[in-house]
Regions:
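A surface-exposed partner-binding patch
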Residues: 1-115, 186-207
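Long, low-complexity, intrinsically disordered segments enriched in glycines and aromatic residues
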Residues: 63-182
Length: 207
């Protein structure tokens, strides 16, 4: 069954947790959400020169990432959720190293992979999501579109989480995942058009 398009960002996140929290640590390790004042104080502390999109504020008002001592927790398929301090500190380190462009703020990570949101100087409701690894590229239209796509992957069985030896593993139907992500993110069609030869005979399911 497809997910409900009218869900709020927080409702989407809670529904994703219904799948990934088969690992008891997931809910236990989520940090309490931040107030708007706390969010703004952290932004100022790190001299972050951009305005956080509304959907990022909603994300961190929901929960402030996972506790720092446990990176095995998955908010969704194999990626963990950075605290706002971690996100801003990582952004600062990236700028010092010249690793990525300045207007990308990391939110989710796994072993050198990063999902980053594009930010602007002025307040925006949303921002496009970039995948940063060996190559950088836009992969989701917005944070909400990304999370909604992930939720629907769980809802239709394209992602099937399994708890094994105390860890969550996910069985993936790559064709279904590619179909769902393309349905809700127009930017993925642009990527497909650009790299048609690369994806020939394959499924654009990741990232």
């Amino acid at each position: 069954m497809s997910a409900n398009r009218n869900l709020s960002l927080v409702e989407i996140l809670e529904k994703i947790l219904n799948y990934t929290s088969i690992d008891d640590r997931v809910r236990a390790k989520l940090r309490p959400g931040l107030s708007r004042q706390e969010i703004q104080a952290k932004v100022c502390h790190f001299n972050f020169p951009f305005s956080l999109p509304q959907e990022v504020e909603e994300l961190y008002q929901w929960h402030d990432g996972f506790d720092l001592d446990d990176y095995d927790c998955q908010l969704f398929h194999y990626h963990t959720f950075l605290t706002l301090d971690e996100a801003l500190e990582t952004w600062k380190d990236f700028q010092d190293d010249g690793f990525i462009q300045k207007d990308l703020l990391p939110l989710f990570t796994f072993e050198g992979e990063w999902y980053c949101i594009q930010v602007e100087k002025t307040k925006q409701e949303s921002g496009q999501i970039w995948f940063v690894y060996h190559d950088d590229g836009i992969v989701y239209d917005s944070l909400k579109a990304m999370l909604f796509s992930i939720l629907e992957c769980y809802e239709v069985g394209a992602y099937q989480p399994i708890l094994k030896n105390g860890r969550v593993y996910t069985e993936v139907d790559r064709e279904k995942v590619a179909e769902v992500k393309l349905k809700y993110n127009r930017v993925r069609q642009q990527t497909l058009n650009q790299y048609e030869k690369h994806f020939s005979g394959d499924f654009y399911d990741h990232p």
